[in-house]
């Protein structure tokens, strides 16, 4: 039997662009309309209108927390112009969670940017942290009394990799120099946002909230045990998994470490150049591991290993995303069970874990992969928007009810 603390958080996550629908003022929407992206998000899951029904289902599944994101382009549709209607909408969303006993975990940036911000250079703009801070201040002032957990930036390294290394996400650039600049701007934005949020709560005489980032972490393993591969594994784990965390800790701006974990990355270098060390991977053709529908290896032991790499920082950890896209729901339940077992292994070794948030609550728009990948605990019929709870969700509901697997 695998047991969890009585105060453990159980929940699932969504992000605004992936589920709300109609986010027509963001950079992603413009790229979709221009044909620069293959799939169009459209009405997504209509969560913007149906959020109460979705939260009812989360409560039914014994969740006691829910992670969501605020869509910046809704709050600030034009530079310096803020929408009171949208601030009120998100207030209602947060209160709907509170009414159902779900602790909100609020993410302020989850990949998408306002169109006006993008046209000024996006995160490559020198003033980008200042623009972000202005938006953060408005949101936090509006929601402060009802939010204990804030996530400033979701997966900064994933954003960098897809937008500035591979060039498949907006702004579709391929530049190591730009990537370094954007990384620094995201870090400065997080540090300043942390201090701003903490200051707002102090000014309002509210208890200090828990503030962090959501860091995507991969279990890097060498394909062959060559010196070059081992060195690359070390450097990637350091730069991809840990650098943003360490720099945030050095600035005193992490109250916990938010972890998103999905899979491993098998490293096989083909040369000694910088790009080789950053990007070379094994094609995985000889791997006998089971895979999700996107072809990612299912590697539960990697969760324990990345958590153990965080133990030295002596901060609590919150699993903010862990999930599988699959058309076989029994595979989803197997995935969840094995990752929870791996999680307890790290906890029994001294890693303090606050909670487990599955990705995702409902099927959603999976960025450049469209609507094909099915991550949800809840099935969404994209023709009727009908929700159907999957059996894996009901099994996880028993775990969260009893705090044991």
Regions found by a protein language model. Give the residues of each.
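Catalytic domains of carbohydrate-active enzymes, especially glycoside hydrolases
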Residues: 50-71, 252-257
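Glycine-rich, proline-tolerant flexible connector loops at the mouths of alpha/beta enzymes
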Residues: 70-84
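Chitinase-like catalytic core of GlcNAc-active glycosidases
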Residues: 46-47
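Active-site region of glycoside hydrolase catalytic domains
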Residues: 1-35, 39, 59, 79, ...
């Amino acid at each position: 039997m695998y047991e969890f603390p009585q105060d453990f958080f159980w929940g699932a996550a969504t992000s605004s662009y992936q589920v709300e629908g109609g986010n027509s003022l963001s950079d992603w929407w413009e790229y979709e309309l221009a044909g620069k992206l293959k799939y169009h998000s459209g009405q997504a899951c209509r969560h913007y209108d149906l959020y109460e029904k979705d939260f009812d289902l989360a409560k039914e599944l014994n969740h006691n927390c829910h992670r969501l994101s605020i869509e910046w382009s809704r709050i600030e549709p034009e530079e310096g112009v803020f929408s009171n209607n949208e601030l009120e909408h998100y207030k209602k969303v947060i209160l709907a969670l509170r009414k159902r006993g779900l602790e909100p975990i609020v993410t302020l940036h989850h990949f998408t940017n306002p169109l006006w911000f993008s046209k000024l250079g996006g995160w490559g703009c020198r003033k980008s942290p200042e623009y972000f801070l202005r938006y953060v201040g408005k949101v936090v002032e509006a929601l402060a009394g009802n939010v204990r957990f804030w996530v400033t930036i979701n997966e900064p390294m994933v954003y960098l990799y897809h937008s500035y290394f591979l060039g498949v996400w907006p702004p579709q650039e391929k530049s190591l120099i730009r990537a370094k600049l954007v990384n620094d701007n995201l870090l400065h934005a997080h540090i300043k946002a942390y201090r701003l949020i903490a200051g707002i709560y102090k000014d309002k005489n509210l208890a200090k909230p828990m503030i962090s980032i959501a860091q995507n972490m991969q279990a890097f393993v060498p394909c062959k045990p060559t010196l070059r591969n081992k060195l690359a594994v070390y450097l990637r784990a350091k730069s991809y998994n840990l650098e943003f965390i360490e720099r945030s800790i050095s600035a005193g701006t992490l109250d916990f470490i938010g972890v998103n974990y999905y899979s491993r990355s098998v490293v096989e270098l083909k040369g000694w150049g910088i790009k080789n060390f950053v990007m070379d991977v094994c094609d995985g053709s000889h791997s006998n591991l089971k895979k999700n529908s996107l072809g990612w290896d299912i590697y539960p032991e990697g969760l324990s290993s990345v958590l153990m790499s965080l133990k030295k920082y002596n901060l609590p950890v919150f699993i903010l995303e862990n999930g599988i896209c699959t058309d076989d729901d029994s595979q989803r339940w197997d995935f969840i069970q094995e990752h929870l077992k791996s999680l307890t292994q790290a906890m029994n070794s001294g890693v303090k874990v606050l909670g487990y948030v599955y990705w995702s609550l409902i099927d959603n728009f999976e960025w450049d992969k469209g609507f094909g990948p099915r991550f949800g605990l809840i099935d969404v019929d994209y023709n009727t928007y009908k929700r159907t709870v999957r059996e894996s969700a009901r099994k996880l509901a028993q775990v969260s009810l009893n705090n044991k697997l």
